[in-house]
Amino acid sequence: MNPAHLLVLPAVCVSFLGASIIPPQSLNLIQFKDMIRCTIPCERTWGEYADYGCYCGKGGSGRPVDALDRCCYVHDNCYGEAQKRNCNPYMKSYSFKCAKRTLFCYDAPGSCARFVCDCDRTAALCFGDSEYIGRHKNIDTKRHCQ
């Protein structure tokens, strides 16, 4: 056996081990990111919308600080409605298309996938229509969101 082959096997094993500790993102989150990218101004990234205001990001409480934060508040409530219908919005994938900053959901009306797609579509379009106020990124939620 060629000694170089002996070096390749451990490298492959190490790369698989390293990859296994990276937490996977749900397909739904990836799709939601793609929807956001479709609707927001080019100078912004989808990541700028995480940890914004009181509701954009994980959890939420208090009163939304602005129109953009209200988009996240409505999105959170929409996901809550999906869960009441025994639909897991965090894991459910769906079919959609982006064309010229417009989003189309293709799953059957009334299905779990369509419900989640409509939640994400509404939020992404709302993001695109709302002003981004830099001072609302990473705000002190204990102070502003009670």
UniProtKB/Swiss-Prot annotation:
Stored SMART domains: PA2c
Disulfide bridge map: 54-145, 56-72, 71-126, 78-119, 87-112, 105-117
Top EC class, one word: hydrolase
Cofactors demanded by this protein: Ca(2+)
Primary location group: secreted
Signal peptide: 1-19
Native source organism of the sequence: Bungarus flaviceps flaviceps (Red-headed krait)
Protein name: Basic phospholipase A2 beta-bungarotoxin A1 chain
CDD domains documented for this protein: PLA2c (cd00125)
Positions of the propeptide segment: 20-27
